[in-house]
Amino acid sequence: MHNNKFKLDIPLLKKWKSLAGSMFITFHRAFDVLINPEESLEQLIELGFDCVLTSGQNENAIDGINNLKSWNEKFGLQINIMPGGGIGIDNCKIFKAAGLSSIHLSGSKIINPIKIPKEVNKELSFLNQPLKDSDTNILRQVVQSFKFS
């Protein structure tokens, strides 16, 4: 998605966009490490991307709200700026109030650990993190809150 200079890999993205044809295409959070985000947004628009998923180049979207709002004001009619990262029921209305029309979240909750079979490499780091599962109640609450705020 981006090269070792932390800029968009335009030839690769042109190829991907060509393969995607008329499908809706989102550029994911690799955007958050690009050096010049506004130039990158212009390039993604020119390439025909529909959406960029971003935390506003911060650890979580609430900390990036100023960037998200600014980009949405400048580019939001040409590409959907979709905040993602740390979004939940407690803060989803902030994004709506900032003029952002969509959000991305896992809507998950921590679940009980499961027994890992002996054939699985238990040293994989993600196996040492709490297990999460999407929670339809959380998702329903966020949708209702965001939709009707």
Question: What do the predicted segments below correspond to?
Answer:
Residues 1-5, 49-62, 100-120, 130:
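Glycine-rich phosphate-binding active-site loops on the catalytic face of alpha/beta enzymes
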Residues 65-74, 94-98, 112-149:
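C-terminal helical cap(s) of enzyme catalytic domains, especially alpha/beta-barrels
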Residues 1, 27-31, 56, 83-85, ...:
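A cross-domain feature marking catalytic cores of carbohydrate-active enzymes
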Residues 1-14, 19:
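Glycine/small-residue-rich loop that forms an oxyanion/phosphate-binding "nest" at active or ligand-binding sites
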Residues 12, 32-47, 69-83, 87-105:
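Catalytic cores of alpha/beta
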Residues 20-23, 74-78, 148-149:
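Short helix-capping segments at alpha-helix termini
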Residues 25-29, 78-87, 128-141:
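Short, basic, helix/turn surface patches
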